[in-house]
Every structure is written in structure tokens, then in C-alpha cells.
Amino acid sequence: NKFNSKGEPLFFESILHFNFKLFKLLRTKNINLNQKDKDENNIIFKLMEYNYKNQIKDKKLYLNTIKSLVNSVVDINAKNKEGLTVLHIAVGEKCEYTLRLLLEMRADCLATDNKGRTIMHNCVWKNTSKYFNLIHHFNKEIINIPDNFGIRPINYAAFMGKKDLVIKMLDAGALVNNSIKKDSRILQFLEKFHSNIINITQNIEKGVDKNNLKLLANNMINEFNIKS
């Protein structure tokens, strides 16, 4: 369980360079596969980092290695120092094939980071709304979970002007009301986006979508103290 000069467990290098002979040798030393580096990343985090930095060319080998590690008791739901899981990272780095694998291996969709945000919040914040349907397919509850500031994903999407995503969320059963107490800091931050709520129905042609957006906006105007 020693570390190298980069603050990583010694076995990380063998996995990151797919040197499985060395890895098998190290395993005879009873290494802890869930050991983390100085930033509290386990080996799956590091593999993913190498991948999104284009340091891994063989994507099939990369995915099979993640699968083998998880099957060898590496914690797929481990968190780093920011409270992020590998699912959060996969969404943020726009890596769909990794995201699909992790979801298929039953990674915890409801895991939250240090700010209480799920991967559905990440879809909004990281501009990866294209993964909404995929995530919602695996978990229907996640759409309405608020973060530590009292904000649901649909609220952030509306404030950020992501109308298409908001409509998808409404069609999928997202709640149009949010009576949860809001943190004063987030209310102040969101003030700069108030106009997006007031104008949310602009350029929306479909009547049912327009009505649903109007209902959401009316609720949010009251809940977030929005002034026209």
C-alpha cells in the first residue's frame, strides 16, 4: 500500500498501462484495490482520466478493464474529495460509452456530490442534456431530487434557458413546484437568470409545451422571488 512520487498507489501504473503481468505479481502482495490517491481517486477514476485525456487508444480494452476491476470488488460508487463518483465524471466529460457501462453495472444513480448534486444536476451544469433519456431510463426518481441548496435539476435547466431539456423533463414527470427552502446564496446567484424564467414560453410553438412551461414559470416566480 505504498505510494509513488505522484501520490498514487503503486499498482495504479500497472493498470493504467495495461501491464497485467505486473499487476498479477502485485496482487500476490495482498494490495487493496480500493486504495485511493492523494485526491481520493480510486483506480477507476484514474483510468477514466487517462481516457478523456486521449492517453488510451484501445477503448475495448479500457472498458473491459473497468468491468474486470468492478467484478474484482473495486467500489464503483467510491467518491473523490469533491464527493464526485465515476458516474458524475462520465457525464461531465461527455463519455457516453463509459456512462453506459457504469449504468449497466448498476452504479448508484442517486449518489450525490459534496453539494448534494446528482448526475442529473450534472446534465444541466455540464451541458450534457443529451444523456437525459439514458439516465432517466435507468432511474426515474433522480429527476426530482434537490441539491443541498434546495434546487431541482428542472429549476437549474429553466434558469439556464435550456428549454428543450425542460420540456423533456416535464414530459418525463418532473415536478413543476418546489416548496423546499432555498439557500439565500443560490437565490442571489440565480438572480442574473430571472429573465429566462419570465421569457420561458417565447418561441415555443406547441400548445401543450407552452402551457406546461407557463405553469412551471408561474410557480418559480413565486418560489424564487422573481421580479418581472
Which positions does each model-derived feature cover?
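Ankyrin-repeat-protein effector appendages
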Residues: 171-228
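Ankyrin repeat A-helix N-terminal signature
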Residues: 13-19, 46-62, 89-95, 122-128, ...
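Ankyrin-repeat and related helical/solenoid repeat scaffolds used for protein-protein interactions
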Residues: 125-129, 141-176
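Ankyrin repeat domain, specifically the short helix-to-loop turn at the C-terminus of the second helix
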Residues: 24-32, 67-75, 100-108, 133-142, ...
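Conserved ankyrin/ankyrin-like repeat signature
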Residues: 21-22, 61, 65, 97-98, ...
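Fold-core signature of tandem repeat domains
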Residues: 10, 26, 33, 43, ...
